[in-house]
């Protein structure tokens, strides 16, 4: 685990604990998702927030103006990050926090690769099968188009890969013929 991820993980876990204590897990989850999207969309704001020439107070004032509508506890957490010069971890903290929420809810993220876009019925069927396989209640599936698969699907859940693509089957046949 990288040092950055380790540091972000500690902050995310602390925030998650506070959210559980105050019954704000879902509120923080939504707001962190929106916050991360805003940070990704507005790189100039991120540069300002990370600018070393700005004082801590200036950064807090900037954050206060931009994040005025978020939960006060979450805003205080952002101030804490600014105080400790950890504001650049905010996006990673949001990811780790969301993973904790997903673990709590029994949800996993999955990337499904196919040659053509899958229908809702196909995605639901895949979700049902692989959620049971992973002992989860639900899968959040992201469907990606990959013409190189030739046919079939490849499902990636965390570090696990389930490859039922025609490309892999042809490669397996080729290996068997050469053996």
Curated annotation (Swiss-Prot):
UniProt membrane topology term: Peripheral membrane protein
GO CC, any one term: plasma membrane
Compartment(s) of residence: Cell membrane
Main location, first listed in the record: membrane
InterPro entries cross-referenced by the UniProt entry: ATP_synth_OSCP/delta_N_sf, ATPase_OSCP/dsu
Record's keyword annotation contains Disulfide bond: no
GO molecular function list: proton-transporting ATP synthase activity, rotational mechanism
Pfam families in the record: OSCP
The keyword Membrane is assigned to this record: yes
Sorted UniProt keywords: ATP synthesis, Cell membrane, CF(1), Hydrogen ion transport, Ion transport, Membrane, Transport
SUPFAM superfamilies listed in its UniProt record: N-terminal domain of the delta subunit of the F1F0-ATP synthase
Family classification: Belongs to the ATPase delta chain family.
UniProt function note: F(1)F(0) ATP synthase produces ATP from ADP in the presence of a proton or sodium gradient. F-type ATPases consist of two structural domains, F(1) containing the extramembraneous catalytic core and F(0) containing the membrane proton channel, linked together by a central stalk and a peripheral stalk. During catalysis, ATP synthesis in the catalytic domain of F(1) is coupled via a rotary mechanism of the central stalk subunits to proton translocation.
NCBIfam families named among the record's database cross-references: ATP_synt_delta, PRK05758.2-4
PANTHER family given in the database record: ATP SYNTHASE DELTA CHAIN
Subunit record text: F-type ATPases have 2 components, F(1) - the catalytic core - and F(0) - the membrane proton channel. F(1) has five subunits: alpha(3), beta(3), gamma(1), delta(1), epsilon(1). F(0) has three main subunits: a(1), b(2) and c(10-14). The alpha and beta chains form an alternating ring which encloses part of the gamma chain. F(1) is attached to F(0) by a central stalk formed by the gamma and epsilon chains, while a peripheral stalk is formed by the delta and b chains.
HAMAP family: ATP_synth_delta_bact
Name of the protein: ATP synthase subunit delta
Organism: Listeria welshimeri serovar 6b (strain ATCC 35897 / DSM 20650 / CCUG 15529 / CIP 8149 / NCTC 11857 / SLCC 5334 / V8)
